[in-house]
């Protein structure tokens, strides 16, 4: 059996999902691939790490390595009462790890889809997204929202996804065929479980508690004045970002490419200045991409390194990416990865 599980880019709506706001991601045509068969225990070889891991299903102890994502999936399935056996196989693919393209969620969904097929668990795509999030939150220990798992489970070729992360209502939006998304991986690995991510999440939760709101969607600009300075700055960014997601959705429906690009640029400047999760490398890419003709550009994912994206006219992404990469390597010691992506199908078993 072979499973393809895509990565994702978030076109707009960053750091809004853990306060139940709006997001607008798409699954991409870069994949985690698992090739294997059912087995009595777990035996997996990682082509990326060039290492094997094996464990019994009764012994799901964290090891602080890539196997934790597999163990987390088993742990949550067992807790939810599913009868599931082991797996034996290889993990590979062309999705860069630690790049801000949701390689961890992609891996978890790949494991879930494999087990769903192998053991006839009858899980829906929503079931798989929610189980993967629970594994990440409660076993791996990363306090992420639902964005990544949902995008990877529900991806559709040629479509972006508008998602309300509170209600989980979603809408497929056709992505313009005359545009493409350039991904620029800075080479700066970022640990999502870092204290900075957790600190922002905690500040947002505290701000919502003070205001008596269940979601950032319900907070107005006027209400922000009731908050201390740090919480006001952080939640202010999230409130504005929710508005930008709605505006981006409208622009996408109307084919207003200029508005889409402008909203991406505003989003990046706001997140860099007020949420403070950007870095020199991400800012450099955004600035240079815009100078070289990108319609819009911004960081994607949690920030603190990882990847940025640019919205470009179809056929121009690769050359623009190469130009920025050439400038980038003269300034920074990292080797970037540059590639063009299109909206892709969600996790699939072949």
UniProtKB/Swiss-Prot annotation:
Substrate binds at residues 14-17, 197. Mg(2+) binds at residues 104, 136. The lineage of its organism: Archaea, Methanobacteriati, Methanobacteriota, Thermococci, Thermococcales. It comes from the Archaea. One of its GO terms (molecular function) is ATP binding. The keyword Repeat does not apply. ATP binds at residues 46, 98-104. Belongs to the GHMP kinase family. GalK subfamily. Catalyzes the transfer of the gamma-phosphate of ATP to D-galactose to form alpha-D-galactose-1-phosphate (Gal-1-P). PROSITE patterns: GALACTOKINASE, GHMP_KINASES_ATP. Keywords: ATP-binding, Carbohydrate metabolism, Cytoplasm, Galactose metabolism, Kinase, Magnesium, Metal-binding, Nucleotide-binding, Transferase. The gene is galK. GO terms for cellular component: cytosol. PANTHER family: GALACTOKINASE-RELATED, MEVALONATE KINASE/GALACTOKINASE. GO terms for biological process: galactose metabolic process. It catalyses: alpha-D-galactose + ATP = alpha-D-galactose 1-phosphate + ADP + H(+). Pfam families: GalKase_gal_bdg, GHMP_kinases_C, GHMP_kinases_N. HAMAP family: Galactokinase. The active site is at 148 (proton acceptor). It is found in: Cytoplasm. Pathway: Carbohydrate metabolism; galactose metabolism. Coiled coil: none annotated. This is Galactokinase. The record marks 8 as: Transition state stabilizer. Its EC number is 2.7.1.6.
């Amino acid at each position: 059996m072979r499973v393809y599980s895509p990565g994702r880019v978030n076109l707009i709506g960053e750091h809004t999902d853990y306060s139940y706001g709006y997001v607008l991601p798409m699954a991409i045509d870069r994949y985690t691939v698992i090739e294997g068969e059912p087995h009595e225990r777990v035996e997996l070889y990682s082509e990326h790490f060039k290492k094997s891991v094996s464990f019994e299903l009764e012994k799901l102890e964290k090891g602080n390595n890539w196997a934790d994502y597999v163990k987390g999936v088993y742990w949550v399935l067992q807790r939810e009462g599913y009868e599931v056996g082991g797996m034996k196989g290889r993990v590979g693919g062309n999705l860069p790890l630690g790049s801000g393209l949701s390689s961890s969620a992609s891996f978890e969904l790949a494991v879930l889809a494999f087990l769903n097929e192998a053991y006839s668990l009858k899980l829906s795509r929503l079931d798989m997204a929610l189980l993967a999030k629970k594994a990440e939150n409660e076993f791996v220990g990363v306090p992420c929202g639902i964005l990544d798992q949902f995008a990877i489970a529900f991806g559709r070729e040629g479509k972006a996804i508008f998602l309300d992360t509170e209600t989980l209502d979603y809408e497929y939006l056709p992505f313009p065929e005359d545009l493409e998304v350039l991904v620029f991986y800075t080479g700066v690995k970022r640990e999502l479980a870092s204290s900075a991510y957790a600190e922002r999440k905690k500040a947002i939760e505290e701000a919502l508690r003070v205001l008596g709101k269940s979601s950032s969607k319900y907070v107005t600009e006027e209400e922000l004045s009731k908050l201390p300075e740090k919480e006001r700055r952080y939640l202010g960014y999230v409130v504005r970002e929710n508005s930008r997601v709605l505006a981006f959705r409208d622009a996408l429906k109307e084919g207003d490419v200029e508005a889409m690009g402008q909203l991406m640029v505003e989003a990046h400047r706001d997140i860099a200045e007020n949420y403070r999760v950007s870095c020199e490398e991400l800012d450099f890419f955004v600035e240079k991409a815009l100078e070289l003709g990108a319609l819009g550009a911004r960081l994607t994912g949690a920030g603190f390194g990882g990847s940025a994206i640019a919205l470009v006219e179809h056929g121009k992404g690769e050359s623009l990416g190469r130009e920025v990469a050439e400038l980038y390597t003269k300034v920074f010691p990292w080797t970037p990865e540059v590639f063009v992506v299109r909206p892709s199908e969600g996790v699939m078993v072949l």
